[in-house]
Amino acid sequence: MQVLSSLKSAKNRHPDCQVVRRRGRVFVINKTDGRFKAVQGKKKK
């Protein structure tokens, strides 16, 4: 899963990508191809 500061490019990478909000974070999920998962925020140290 990618950790990105902006999800605009992540949601346009595949037609099936959708933006969802879970646990106060914004995720991009793709049920047909799991390579396109992403989350918005900072990386953990």
Curated annotation (Swiss-Prot):
Q: Which UniProt keywords apply?
A: Ribonucleoprotein, Ribosomal protein
InterPro entries with a match to the protein in the record:
Ribosomal_bL36 (IPR000473), Ribosomal_bL36_sp (IPR035977), Ribosomal_L36_bact (IPR047621)
GO CC entries = ribonucleoprotein complex; ribosome
Which GO terms fall under biological process for this protein?
Answer: translation
**Do you know which Pfam families this protein is assigned to?**
Ribosomal_L36
GO MF terms held by the record: structural constituent of ribosome
NCBIfam families to which the protein is assigned, alphabetical? PRK00831.1
Cross-referenced HAMAP family: Ribosomal_bL36
Query: What family does the entry list?
Result: Belongs to the bacterial ribosomal protein bL36 family.
Protein name, per record: Large ribosomal subunit protein bL36
Annotated organism of origin: Psychrobacter sp. (strain PRwf-1)
What gene does this protein come from? rpmJ
